[in-house]
Design a protein with these regions (language model features):
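Post-HExxH zinc-binding segment in Zn-dependent metallohydrolases
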Residues: 222, 228-229, 253-254, 265-316
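Hydrophobic residues positioned within well-ordered beta-strands of beta-sheet architectures
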Residues: 4, 16-20, 75-77, 117-119, ...
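Juxtacatalytic substrate-recognition/specificity segment
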Residues: 161-273
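Generic, well-ordered alpha-helical scaffold segments in large soluble proteins
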Residues: 183-194, 240, 244-248, 252, ...
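A generic structural motif
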Residues: 23, 122, 487-489
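Early extracytoplasmic/domain-onset interaction patches
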Residues: 1-36
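C-terminal recognition in membrane/secretory proteostasis and scaffolding
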Residues: 284, 294, 298-529
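Non-catalytic architectural context of zinc metalloproteases
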Residues: 9, 38, 43-52, 56-200, ...
Length: 529
């Protein structure tokens, strides 16, 4: 058994104190901190936050230590961890809460990863976690279970409801969740109807008010950061919560073979991220429609927005969905690069492709619901199984493995939905925020003007600009073929370019109900729970 202890001295320091006690399985046993965490398919640098380790620990590598001990000796090591950044996958400590994720905090002992773990938390604050509790001890089956079980300690509020034989708890810090109980009840009911069962007795949403939207799935819980003061807050909240809850089945229990068991020390590329995250996004938002929270037209408006996002990416013309999934590990969204032209989100295209696949299956008397039930019965999610159950090689060859244009008009027509496009206002193919260029579309006027991501855009056509909408405003009287002047700063210098406007205005997508009484659409969106 491995004994972990967590405490803190002063919340203003944002430092957790961690102690680990174990019997050394060998001489000089190694202790390792994960290089990434499940739910975030990128390598991360958690070890940079580790400091002040005891003298009996010696560092061997970026995230590897060894203990000064001989085989069979009882060892205790201590260290501190800085927890000053709040996101759903981090650990965080301030005067109102202690939020801890084991994948950031807890070293595992090489050779003892399958041993039972006990975590003692030294605090007078109440604690919420999915781990079973005996007194002040939290118990985990093994290290994987320990780090897949985040916890909140502090001044939280709780809303609870019963649904489908399980207790669902909304545990929140800095966010009022009372109004979400009934919508969440409907969402839970609809997702249970897809799979036919709810495989837990209790599920917890650990929710933090913050400055962004972010969620991470766990075995019997999820963590969410919700953006306080955001427009359409309730819709975003429910969409995120619905997405994370669907992971209870898809990914947490239907796990690709590549992740069984997890290798926390290295990247684990897979071509299935589109199914793991894209199908989850599809059902997350579909559940809002099926539960009645969204109207049919509101759901179609959401799908149209996702299609717009996808179609705005040049990468869709040369990068398959399977390859975008595989390449997710090398896409660092925090660093400036040409990501918009080289890659797109497997969440976005995965959701769009899942919707088109579902409608295609329904036209032949099947559905994606049935596919998910078969995969759930087999407790499997791998490429061969998905393709075998769907049994449509041409669809996969064209839209998952290939880069064929997606047949929106034809497939949405099956559901009595009309697909329409029109040109938006031109913006040189740029996305601009706070005066800084975030992306430049390949083949656009902005690319012809030699603009790069992270350039400071100073002026367009004689006007000062700070945002994409400012660029649109500056060009509202201009036409294709007109020559305009662009002023920007790069590498400490100011540059001016003259460029001829291309026909590169982005596309606006609209989905309209064309047939009021369409049997396929009615069955697709009807309430099931």
């Amino acid at each position: 058994m491995i004994h972990y202890a967590l405490s803190w001295r002063n919340t203003n320091e944002h430092l957790f104190d961690i102690a680990i006690r174990f019997i050394a399985p060998e001489d000089q046993p190694r202790l390792i901190l994960p290089s990434w965490r499940p739910g975030k398919y990128q390598l991360q640098n958690f070890a940079a936050n580790v400091r002040e380790w005891t003298p009996n620990l010696r560092k061997l590598g970026p995230n590897v230590w060894c203990a000064d001990a001989t085989r069979g000796e009882e060892v205790e090591v201590r260290y501190r961890y800085w927890a000053g950044v709040l996101d759903a996958g981090s650990s965080y400590l301030d005067r109102s809460e202690a939020y801890f994720n084991g994948s950031n905090l807890f070293l595992w002992i090489d050779g003892l990863r399958s041993d039972e773990c006990v975590l003692t938390v030294d605090t007078g604050w109440p604690i919420e976690t999915q781990l079973p509790r005996e007194g002040n001890e939290l118990r985990a089956r093994n290290y994987d279970h320990l780090i897949d079980s985040p916890a909140i300690a502090g001044m939280f509020t709780t809303q609870s409801f019963e649904e489908s034989g399980a207790s669902i708890r909304l545990v929140s810090v800095g966010c009022d969740t009372a109004r979400f109980v009934e919508p969440m009840r409907g969402i839970v009911r609809e997702q249970v109807a897809v799979f036919g069962e709810l495989p837990v007795n209790e599920y917890k949403f650990l929710i933090h008010g913050g400055d962004r939207w972010h969620g991470v799935e766990h075995e019997d819980s999820c963590s969410m950061i919700v953006k306080r003061g955001a427009a359409d807050f309730d819709e975003h909240f429910l969409s995120l919560a619905s997405h994370e809850f669907f992971h209870l089945w898809n990914v947490k229990r239907m796990m690709p073979a590549a992740f069984a068991p997890y290798d926390y020390t290295a990247a684990t590329p897979t071509r299935l991220l589109w199914a793991m995250e894209g199908i989850t996004s599809y059902y997350g938002d579909l559940s809002l429609a099926r539960s009645g929270y969204w109207s049919e037209q509101r759901y179609l408006r959401h799908l149209a927005h996702e299609i717009e996002l996808l179609e705005s990416s040049h990468a869709r013309t040369h990068l398959s969905l399977a390859q975008a999934s595989f390449d997710g590990w090398v896409q660092d969204v925090t660093r400036p690069h040409d990501r918009g032209n080289a890659w797109y989100s497997f969440y976005t295209k995965g959701e769009v492709v899942a919707a088109l696949l579902d409608l295609t299956l329904r036209a032949r008397g099947m559905s994606l619901d049935e596919v998910m039930r078969v995969l759930w019965a087999e407790r499997i999610l791998d490429e061969d199984a998905v393709r075998r159950v769907v049994d449509d090689p041409l669809f996969f060859a064209s839209y998952v493995d290939g880069v064929e244009p997606l047949p929106y008009e034809t497939i949405f027509a099956l559901a009595g939905v009309r697909f329409e496009t029109r040109r938006k206002r031109r913006a040189l193919g740029l996305k601009v925020k706070d005066g800084v260029i975030e992306s430049v579309a390949s083949g656009s006027s902005g690319a012809a003007a030699d603009l790069l991501p992270q350039d400071e855009l100073l002026g367009v056509h004689g006007l000062r600009v700070h945002s994409t909408s400012d660029v649109e405003h500056a060009l509202q009287e201009s036409n294709t073929g007109d020559e305009i002047e662009v002023v920007f700063a790069r590498n400490g210098g100011v540059m001016t370019r003259r460029v001829r406007l291309e026909d590169d205005a982005p596309t606006e997508v609209r989905l309209h109900i064309a047939e009021e009484d369409n049997a396929l659409r009615r069955e697709w969106l009807r309430r099931r729970g």
